[in-house]
């Protein structure tokens, strides 16, 4: 993967939430492509415990909250995969779109939509300054710029797969 920030987003929107096995297979196939800058996985969260109500503090044993392996990197999937945003270098976009469509047809058990555009922030935001402080630009990976939540721990929300 490249560490450049001049990229175009490709949003893959399956018509159903993906199971961990399907998400793992799809992510591994996407990461095989050249010119991928970053991949974001979005969807409803799968909590590890009940956070409110009478059962507060009780552990949630959800079968979809489990570890998956992408490019040899194992991490816990904390969301039901509802959309995947792939950041690609502009020069590789046109030639890779057909390959992405073939991968999606092969891996996804449902229909899907693909959108091309700008779906993520690529410039430094106020939230980045709140999270990292002043003069952080040279100290962090440019792929994480614009992806932070100032109140969360980065190790809980971002997995860096190389």
UniProtKB/Swiss-Prot annotation:
InterPro entries: Me_CoM_Rdtase_D. GO terms for biological process: methanogenesis. Keywords: Methanogenesis. It holds the Pfam family MCR_D. MCR is composed of three subunits: alpha, beta, and gamma. The function of protein D is not known. This is Methyl-coenzyme M reductase II operon protein D. It comes from Methanothermobacter thermautotrophicus (strain ATCC 29096 / DSM 1053 / JCM 10044 / NBRC 100330 / Delta H).
């Amino acid at each position: 993967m490249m560490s450049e920030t001049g990229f175009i987003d490709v949003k893959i929107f399956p018509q159903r939430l993906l199971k961990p096995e399907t998400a793992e297979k799809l992510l591994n196939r996407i990461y095989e492509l050249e010119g991928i800058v970053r991949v974001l996985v979005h969807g409803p969260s799968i909590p590890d415990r009940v956070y409110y109500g009478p059962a507060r503090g009780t552990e949630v044993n959800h079968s979809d909250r489990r570890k998956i392996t992408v490019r040899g990197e194992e991490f816990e999937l904390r969301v039901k995969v509802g959309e995947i945003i792939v950041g690609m270098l502009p020069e590789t976009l046109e030639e890779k779109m057909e390959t992405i469509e073939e991968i999606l047809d092969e891996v996804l058990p449902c229909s899907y939509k693909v959108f091309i555009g700008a779906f993520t922030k690529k410039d430094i935001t106020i939230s980045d300054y709140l999270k990292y402080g002043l003069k952080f630009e040279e100290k962090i990976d440019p792929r994480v710029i614009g992806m932070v939540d100032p109140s969360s721990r980065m190790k809980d929300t971002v997995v860096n797969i190389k």
